[in-house]
């Protein structure tokens, strides 16, 4: 079977993700032209290219931020239609964006932001987390990731580096199938990146 690649456009058995012929255009520019990408489960994969090559655009298609793409997305051997962030989340896809200020809710605490996805998923269900339980789970996730921030601290009180780490913790807390990281450690120091 060889590497985690494509064989004549067919889905390789065991692939977690397959993006086929993904194209997207914005007024005056074709951002992606029949892009292809595949990933195996349990492995880290990287998109490498020059600025403006379409790496972030491809990741945003997967996250549901760009609904007007053409092409196919396959997840665990099944075709999926991802046209919104809710579609991505329903399919077990999480993304950590470069833009931390738009991804976190500043009026909420660190713990509330870390557990936000799970809390929203459980809205209307009897499994609503009690606030004490939420903070305990958030504290455990932060500790496991060596993030030294109190879960009760407000996000608006954090440094940019701390915000980035909280955003990564939130993505990890969901136990998703596919975690997309768009330069997640760009705002962090070498030491902070190594600790994460």
Briefly describe each language-model feature range:
Residues 9, 13-196:
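Glycine-rich phosphate-binding loops of nucleotide-dependent enzymes
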